[in-house]
């Protein structure tokens, strides 16, 4: 999905609210069993996916995210793979990210 999304970070102790604005897309394996189950269109599962991503990003402060974006990426990917199948969701793409 090419929509721009906003996620809140965990409080960092500076008294300010910090957030991530980005686009998120999923790379899918069209040959997987999951593809046969869910197809190319995960829109019916969008709310579940976004809730998972929101929870994960909310576990990190902005500083933690900026220091180790790959940890956040890996946690999101592993969570979605566990839910939908590792052979189906092969990557999570966080694009045009802006933190504030």
Show which residues each predicted segment covers.
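Flexible, low-complexity charged segments
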Residues: 1-100
């Amino acid at each position: 999905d090419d929509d721009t999304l906003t996620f809140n970070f965990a409080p960092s102790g500076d008294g300010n609210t910090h957030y991530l604005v980005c686009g998120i897309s999923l790379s899918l394996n069209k040959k997987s069993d999951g593809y046969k189950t869910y197809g190319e269109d995960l829109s019916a599962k969008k709310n579940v996916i976004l809730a998972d991503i929101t929870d994960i990003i909310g576990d990190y402060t902005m500083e933690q995210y900026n220091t180790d974006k790959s940890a956040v990426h890996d946690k999101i990917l592993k969570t979605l793979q566990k839910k939908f199948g590792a052979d189906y969701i092969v990557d999570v793409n966080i694009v045009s990210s802006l933190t504030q």
